Structure formats: structure tokens, C-alpha cells
């Protein structure tokens, strides 16, 4: 079975309860490794009045060298250690504060995530599954990252792409956790062309649509203008480049050379993988719109995620593309209001994320 490294997220959230309640079923389709120290796990289990059997847990430690070892088997738990350069001393000796934003919990969740990420990178597991963190807790812990995807870009020095959804609808985000006022400045021919090229090469979706940035997709330049001035040109260029089968070196050169761009367009015949014009966003998510195209790219976060979650909240997942590791996540937050209350929780997104990671690795 495939091995999944699972980071604990924010220990004050519903993440640990999702993990424990799902463990038996999850273990039927993969071998999970949970990145949490035994002492902290026991505190959480006591608060939840739950038990965890036949599980593998990984205690992580800051060290200059990478080392993975089996430590012991105790109370039906297999305990391992993973040493690596984390940049912070690991402190697992703090109290769980259910539903509260806490810097210690934030830092611990980050280190669990970083350790699990490199565990996969070092080939000890096949994919990474992350449970939800709280961005304010990360900020209070002095961390510079706005979330998992932002951190993964820094870890691996790659331009990670965030994609969310399910088999009925997937959406790639051109921009993520940035203020809306900054999005238009980010939309350049170069930035968008690189994104569209990378998004296709990571997914190989056969038909994709780019959602308009402005209302009515700009109405032929009447509103805004990004669609006609930038987006249509980037779509045409990327479609022509992908059709040409030319290499990355040529792509980088053509980005700066209008003559090469014209040459590509002249030689391009037929349909591209991207629809030629930006789609009007307010109709793209209707039944008719999704029947036409259900693999989309959005210029900003809420343009895609508001309708996605309205339609498929229970089973949507988060996938990080364009990285040296496979990373998936649940598509929901910390749900502090439900944490440690034995409330009814939906684990469908968690299972869908795990299954997606397993299938993706099998196809690799």
C-alpha cells in the first residue's frame, strides 16, 4: 500500500479528531504516518475520550542531518523519529486549548507540516496530506508564510500552484492569499503565460477555461481591459506553444520575443487546450456552464472558491501542483467551533484527498 505522511495541522482544531475517527478506514487504503509526538497525542485523545490503535506516529526533531528510525512499539502504537533541519526547536510540551488561536500550537503545526513534507521528499512516503492550520496562529508564532502552499514554494524553490475541487469541478488559482487590490498588478502576460503552461503540464486536462477577471469578462474592454489586453493574448500564446511541442528553453525565449510569438501563432491550427476567450464568471458555474467546461482557472481566490464550496463543499480537496512531492489537503478550515466537542464532523474531504494522492502517485 502507498504510504501517506500526514501533518497534524493546528492541534486546537478538528484536525486531530478527523485523523483519529478516520484511522481505521484510512488504513484499509494506505499506510498513514502521523506527525505528532506521543505525549501530545495522548493529551488530545484524553480530551476527546477516544483511542488510536495500530497507528504509526513520527516524532520530529530539529537536527543538522536527516535521519529516520524506528524507536519502539507501545500501546499498539509504532513510534518513529525523524530528524531534519527544521530551523526551530520542537516543543511538544504545551497544553491544548480547544478552539483557540495559540502561537505554540501554530508553530507545532508548522513543524509537523515541514517534517512531513521532507519525509515525502526523502522518499520515506509517497505523498503528503495536510490537516488544516490557522494562519493567525502561524503569524503569532513569527512565521512568514500565509499558508501551506506559500511555505512549499519556499521549501522547494518551485512555483507551486493551488488547485481545488473534485472530479465534477477543478479550479486552479492564479493568485491565492493576497489582497484583492493587488491581483490586477499580478496579471501580466509573462506571469499568466507561465501559469497556464505549468497548470496544463501538471494536470493534462484536455479542455480548460480561464474565468474573466472583470464583470462580464470585461465586456469587450469596456470594463477593466485585462481580458483583451493580457488574458486573450496569454491564452493564444500558450495554446500555440503547447501545440508546437517545443521545449522550455524556447518558451522562455518566446516570452520576451514578439516575433517568436507571432511565428507560433501563424503555425498554430485547430483547437487549443484552453478555450480561446475568458469565460464570464457569473455563468461559468451554472449547469450549462459546467457542462461546457468544468476545468477552470480563476484570477483570484473567492472568484472560484465561493461557487466551488457552494456546490461541492463536502468532497472538495486542495492539491498543490508543480512541486517535487505530491501534496493534498482537506478543503476546509480549522472549525474551532467544533473542536473537542465530539460534534458531528464530515470526513469526506479527508478521504477524497487521500484517495486522490494515492491515485496520482499510481499514475506517476
From Swiss-Prot:
Q: Primary place of residence?
A: cytoplasm
Give the signal peptide, or none: none
Where is it localised?
A: Cytoplasm
What residues bind substrate, as annotated?
148-149, 309, 318, 327
Which cofactors go with this protein? Answer: Zn(2+); Mg(2+); Co(2+)
How is the subunit organization of this protein annotated in UniProt?
Homodimer.
What organism does the record attribute this protein to?
Answer: Campylobacter jejuni subsp. jejuni serotype O:2 (strain ATCC 700819 / NCTC 11168)
Q: Which gene encodes it?
A: pdxA
Q: What does this protein do?
A: Catalyzes the NAD(P)-dependent oxidation of 4-(phosphooxy)-L-threonine (HTP) into 2-amino-3-oxo-4-(phosphooxy)butyric acid which spontaneously decarboxylates to form 3-amino-2-oxopropyl phosphate (AHAP).
Q: Does the keyword tRNA-binding apply?
A: no
- Name this protein carries in UniProt: 4-hydroxythreonine-4-phosphate dehydrogenase
Amino acid at each position: 500500500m502507498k504510504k501517506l505522511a500526514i501533518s497534524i495541522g493546528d492541534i486546537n482544531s478538528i484536525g486531530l479528531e478527523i485523523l483519529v475517527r478516520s484511522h481505521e478506514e484510512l488504513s484499509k487504503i494506505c499506510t498513514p504516518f502521523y506527525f505528532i509526538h506521543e505525549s501530545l497525542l495522548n493529551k488530545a485523545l484524553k480530551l476527546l475520550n477516544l483511542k488510536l490503535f495500530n497507528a504509526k506516529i513520527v516524532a520530529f526533531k530539529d537536527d543538522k542531518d536527516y535521519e529516520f528510525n524506528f524507536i519502539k512499539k507501545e500501546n499498539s502504537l509504532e513510534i518513529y523519529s525523524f530528524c531534519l533541519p527544521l530551523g526551530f526547536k520542537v516543543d511538544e510540551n504545551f497544553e491544548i486549548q480547544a478552539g483557540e488561536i495559540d502561537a505554540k500550537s501554530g508553530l507545532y503545526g508548522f513543524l509537523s507540516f515541514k517534517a512531513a513534507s521532507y519525509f515525502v521528499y526523502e522518499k520515506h512516503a509517497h505523498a503528503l496530506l495536510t490537516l488544516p492550520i490557522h494562519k493567525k496562529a502561524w503569524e503569532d508564532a513569527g512565521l512568514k508564510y500565509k499558508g501551506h502552499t506559500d511555505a512549499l514554494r519556499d521549501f522547494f524553490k518551485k512555483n507551486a500552484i493551488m488547485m481545488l475541487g473534485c472530479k465534477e469541478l477543478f479550479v486552479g488559482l492564479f493568485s491565492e492569499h493576497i489582497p484583492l487590490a493587488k491581483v490586477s498588478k499580478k496579471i501580466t502576460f509573462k506571469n499568466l503565460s507561465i501559469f497556464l503552461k505549468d497548470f496544463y503540464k501538471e494536470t493534462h486536462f484536455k479542455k480548460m477555461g480561464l474565468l474573466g477577471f472583470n464583470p462580464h469578462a470585461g465586456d469587450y474592454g469596456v470594463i477593466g481591459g485585462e481580458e483583451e489586453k493580457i488574458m486573450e493574448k496569454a491564452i493564444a500564446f500558450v495554446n500555440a506553444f503547447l501545440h508546437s511541442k517545443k521545449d522550455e528553453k524556447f518558451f522562455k525565449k518566446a516570452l520576451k520575443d514578439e516575433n517568436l510569438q507571432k511565428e507560433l501563432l501563424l503555425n498554430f491550427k485547430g483547437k487549443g487546450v484552453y478555450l480561446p476567450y475568458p469565460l464570464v464568471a457569473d455563468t461559468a458555474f451554472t449547469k450549462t456552464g459546467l457542462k461546457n467546461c468544468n476545468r477552470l482557472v480563476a484570477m483570484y481566490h473567492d472568484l472560484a472558491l465561493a461557487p466551488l464550496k457552494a456546490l461541492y463543499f463536502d468532497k472538495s480537496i486542495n492539491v498543490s501542483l508543480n512541486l517535487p512531492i505530491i501534496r493534498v489537503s482537506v478543503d476546509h478550515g480549522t472549525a474551532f467551533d467544533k473542536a473537542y466537542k465530539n460534534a458531528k464532523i464530515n470526513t469526506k474531504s479527508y478521504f477524497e484527498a487521500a484517495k486522490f494522492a494515492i491515485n496520482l502517485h499510481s499514475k506517476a
